[in-house]
Amino acid sequence: MAKKPWKKKYGYGIRPCQRCGHVGPGLIRKYGLNLCRQCFREIAHKLGFKKLD
């Protein structure tokens, strides 16, 4: 009888990026974005974020 795969309930691998599906560290969850940092950099300006100098 084969073992059932263990499903993570918490930690890095639980939530994927909403845009590309990347799983792991680098996920931005603030304000309910749920985007990886690469996707956030690509669309941050469209979302209304401004880069400060």
Swiss-Prot record:
- Which cofactor(s) are needed, names only? Zn(2+)
Q: Extract the HAMAP family matched here.
A: Ribosomal_uS14_2_A (MF_01364_A)
Please give an example of a GO cellular component term from this record.
Answer: cytosolic small ribosomal subunit
User: Which Pfam families does the entry mention?
Assistant: Ribosomal_S14
Q: What is the designated name of this protein? A: Small ribosomal subunit protein uS14
List of residues binding Zn(2+)? 17, 20, 36, 39
Q: Which UniProt keywords apply?
A: Metal-binding, Ribonucleoprotein, Ribosomal protein, RNA-binding, rRNA-binding, Zinc
Which molecular-function annotation in GO is an example for this chain?
A: structural constituent of ribosome
**Tell me, which GO biological process terms does this entry list?**
cytoplasmic translation
- Asked whether the keyword Zinc is assigned, the reply is yes
This protein's assembly is summarised as: Part of the 30S ribosomal subunit.
InterPro entries, per the entry = Ribosomal_uS14, Ribosomal_uS14_arc, Ribosomal_uS14_CS, RIbosomal_uS14_euk_arc, Ribosomal_uS14_sf
Role, per record = Binds 16S rRNA, required for the assembly of 30S particles.
Which NCBIfam families does this chain map to? PRK05766.1
The organism that produces this protein has a lineage beginning with: Archaea, Methanobacteriati, Methanobacteriota, Methanomada group, Methanococci
What detail does the entry give on cofactor binding? Binds 1 zinc ion per subunit.
Q: Which family is it part of?
A: Belongs to the universal ribosomal protein uS14 family. Zinc-binding uS14 subfamily.
